[in-house]
């Protein structure tokens, strides 16, 4: 499957194979990661990587784009069908690039952004001070109640006070559904545009397993991987023709040059997979598996942010524990369970240490694991956390879970 690479660069080839083994033998539970479709990888590794195509279909700056025009047009049409919207830009290189392009299109420097606080589950691009958005614009944030749910009343009061030009509703670590209708009411109250960032839940949205951002959001951004299982990339959607034109200009020439045609082809392939009935079954499994995991952890008296989950992820709360999110991340990693440390509401520790971990079900669900496996995993996570310094236990659990993982290969044949 990788003949030329093995011959020309055995060092990189061996490292890729090492990563292939790691992905097969470990339990990938980072909520933002997933296993893409083999067809998507084939498109990404195609000759399309050779083609420059600055501009848009039928309006390029380079010649020889007649084929890639068809490919990008197909990706756009499939995205519009998948998300039931009128306009789509498929050129954004990532979710962050998509968000930055939206701001570039719709805001002026130092305009006001209202987004979810980073420690409550927001993303860096929602106005965090350390990000581009926090430096080029005036950023404000809303948070969650003591119960871990978004405080919509607080969000309204802040919006009324600061009068933002744009409100961002979306997250990178929030275990509940977003009420897009409530956010639109807040936006209308203060005359703001509403950006729905569905990067994490897009796969649930398109299958009816999560509320849809349209018709409430003026513009929607997403990644094309995570719960969609497509290639790494970004996507911008809208039903407003004027906004769509501004978005196109903001992507090119505003924030990007040549689009990645091999990735755009892979996005088109991914969207076709997302439109299949089998993908609906997958999305249901993602949600049901997370419910099983949450139940198993709660039965072992572990504290979860918001008390549970309504989507593909959960957050464990260690505010009252002697160990940190970093400690748990390392211990579970030693046991073959890959998660990530994460800040949580009421955070008291350093962002590089944290008081929580984020766990997702999308990747293991893609391998075909179900309720039985997720109950086992929940019990093993509990065992590790209850004896967090027991290295021998971690190594023992790692071997047990490796045997289980090998029953659910990531891909049915060797593929890089």
Curated annotation (Swiss-Prot):
Pathway: One-carbon metabolism; tetrahydrofolate interconversion; Amino-acid biosynthesis; glycine biosynthesis; glycine from L-serine: step 1/1. Its EC number is 2.1.2.1. It comes from the Bacteria. It catalyses: (6R)-5,10-methylene-5,6,7,8-tetrahydrofolate + glycine + H2O = (6S)-5,6,7,8-tetrahydrofolate + L-serine. It is found in: Cytoplasm. CDD domains: SHMT. (6S)-5,6,7,8-tetrahydrofolate binds at residues 118, 122-124, 242. Pfam families: SHMT (PF00464). Keywords: Amino-acid biosynthesis, Cytoplasm, One-carbon metabolism, Pyridoxal phosphate, Transferase. The keyword Transferase applies. One of its GO terms (molecular function) is glycine hydroxymethyltransferase activity. InterPro entries: PyrdxlP-dep_Trfase, PyrdxlP-dep_Trfase_major, PyrdxlP-dep_Trfase_small, Ser_HO-MeTrfase, Ser_HO-MeTrfase-like, Ser_HO-MeTrfase_PLP_BS, SHMT-like_dom. PROSITE patterns: SHMT. The record marks 225 as: Plays an important role in substrate specificity. Its main location: cytoplasm. GO terms for cellular component: cytosol. The modification N6-(pyridoxal phosphate)lysine is found at residue 226. GO terms for biological process: glycine biosynthetic process from serine; tetrahydrofolate interconversion. Catalyzes the reversible interconversion of serine and glycine with tetrahydrofolate (THF) serving as the one-carbon carrier. This reaction serves as the major source of one-carbon groups required for the biosynthesis of purines, thymidylate, methionine, and other important biomolecules. Also exhibits THF-independent aldolase activity toward beta-hydroxyamino acids, producing glycine and aldehydes, via a retro-aldol mechanism. Homodimer. Belongs to the SHMT family. This is Serine hydroxymethyltransferase. It comes from Helicobacter pylori (strain HPAG1).
């Amino acid at each position: 499957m990788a003949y030329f690479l093995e011959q020309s660069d055995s060092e990189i080839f061996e490292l890729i194979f090492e990563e292939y083994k790691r992905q097969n033998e470990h339990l990938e539970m980072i909520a933002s990661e997933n296993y893409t479709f083999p067809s998507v990888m084939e498109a990404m590794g195609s000759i399309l990587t050779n083609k420059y195509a600055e501009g848009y279909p039928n309006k390029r700056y380079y010649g020889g784009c007649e084929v890639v025009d068809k490919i990008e047009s197909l990706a756009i049409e499939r995205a519009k069908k998948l998300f039931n919207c009128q306009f789509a830009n498929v050129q954004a290189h990532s979710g962050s690039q998509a968000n930055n392009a939206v701001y570039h299109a719709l805001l002026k420097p130092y305009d006001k952004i209202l987004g979810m606080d980073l420690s409550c589950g927001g993303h860096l691009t929602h106005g965090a001070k350390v990000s581009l958005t926090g430096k080029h614009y005036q950023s404000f944030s809303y948070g969650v109640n003591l119960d871990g749910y978004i405080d919509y009343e607080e969000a309204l009061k802040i919006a009324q006070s600061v009068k933002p030009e744009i409100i961002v509703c979306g997250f990178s670590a929030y275990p509940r559904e977003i009420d897009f209708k409530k956010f639109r009411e807040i936006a209308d109250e203060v005359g703001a545009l509403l950006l729905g960032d569905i990067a994490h839940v897009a796969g649930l949205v398109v299958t009816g397993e999560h509320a849809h951002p349209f018709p409430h959001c003026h513009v929607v951004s997403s990644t094309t991987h995570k719960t969609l299982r497509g290639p790494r990339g970004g996507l911008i959607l809208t039903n407003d023709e004027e906004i769509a034109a501004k978005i196109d200009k903001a992507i090119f020439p505003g924030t990007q040059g040549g689009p990645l045609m091999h990735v755009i082809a892979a996005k088109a392939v991914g969207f076709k997979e997302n439109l299949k009935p089998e993908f609906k079954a997958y999305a249901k499994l993602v949600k049901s598996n997370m419910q099983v995991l949450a139940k198993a952890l709660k039965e072992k008296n572990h504290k979860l942010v918001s008390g549970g989950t309504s989507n593909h992820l959960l957050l464990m709360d260690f505010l009252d524990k002697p160990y940190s999110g970093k400690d748990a991340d390392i211990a579970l990693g030693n046991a073959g369970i890959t998660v990530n440390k994460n800040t949580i509401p009421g955070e008291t520790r350093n962002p590089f240490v944290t008081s929580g971990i984020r766990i997702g079900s999308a990747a293991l669900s893609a391998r075909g694991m179900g309720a039985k496996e997720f109950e086992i995993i929940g019990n093993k996570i509990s065992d590790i956390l209850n004896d967090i310094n027991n290295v021998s236990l971690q190594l023992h659990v790692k071997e047990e879970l490796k045997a289980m993982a090998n029953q659910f290969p990531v891909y049915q044949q060797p593929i890089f």
